Every structure is written in structure tokens, then in C-alpha cells.
Amino acid sequence: MKTFLVYNTSFFGDMILTNPLCRQLKRVYPHSHLVFISDKTYADVARYMDGVDEVWIYDKHKKHKGIIGFYNFYKEHKNAYSFDAAFIIYGNERGIFLSKLLGAKKIYADSTHKYVHRLLDNPPINYGKWYQIQDQNTYLAELYTQVPTESLPMKYHVPEEAFAYVDSILLKDIHKPIVALNPITKNKEKDLKRPRLFI
């Protein structure tokens, strides 16, 4: 069984844009185990994404802040798995070093840093036709699997307690709620086109 590590300690939207990568890995390796390293604030975002089996919380602002915090995180997880590959979103140097220390056999990231790039198993990336961030994230899987990237929609498993919260608090005394989505961001590469919205 393959075991993968996905590292993204960015913000809410960035986490969601990583989901197609997780889904692509599961599409190619359906029986694999995928560990997602997330910042504490957005751990629930990762926890309920399709394709994610386990979430490790990297509390970069408190518990795991700085070099000592980095080392403590490593000690907490150092013998948990033997990772076949790690996928580091946005070429995060901390994620690359951590993946190496955790023993990932292959590491894929988009980093142009001269010294850090030596730790990667991919050459500088040419995304070709992939210009949207979620597709570029997914392309990292192709570098490992050699299976062509498929532009997958994001899929999120909303927990039942979230529905209960919305019903009891947010929709209290509202008989006909309206839900609006705003798929537009300040960066065109992150905008969600109609078929790319959650399914």
C-alpha cells in the first residue's frame, strides 16, 4: 500500500485548492493512505476533504513555532509512516525539509530555491496548459504517478454536526434560506469556473 504526505499550512482557500491533488492520488492509488499536514486553524478543512485519510496539525504560530517547534513536530511523527512520496504545496521550504526528515522517498514541489531544489525529485516545473492553482497542485501527482493530470472538481464531505449548527444557529427563524457562492478572487488563477465548484 502506498503512503503519501501532502503538506499545506496555508489559508482556507489554499487548502481547498489542494483537494484535487488528493483526489488524483486516490484515483490512481485507491487503497493508498494519505496524510495531510495542515495548520491548526484549518485542520477541519483538510479533515473532511475527499481523499484525505489522516490529518497532522502543524501549529506554526504556537506549539510548532520556530526551529524548536519544528523539531518537536518531527519527534511527534518521525516513525509514524514510511512515505512513498510527499507533495509540498507552494514549495514551502519548511515542508520540504520536514518531508526529508520524515523519510519521504520522493519529494515533489514547485521551488526554484537553488539549494532547496536539490532535495526534490522533480526538475523545475513547466505546467503547460495548467494555469489554475488547483490544476497546478494536481500536476505534482503526475510527476510521481506518470498518469496524466485530470482536472478534478473539489469534493468536501460536510460533517453532520455542521448541518446541525447551520440549522440551529444560522437558519433559526428563516423559512427559505438563500445560499450564494462567490467563486471570484483577486487572482484569476484561483477563480473557480462553474464546472469546478464543489460536487
Task: State the predicted function of each range.
Residues 1-199:
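Catalytic machinery of carbohydrate-active enzymes
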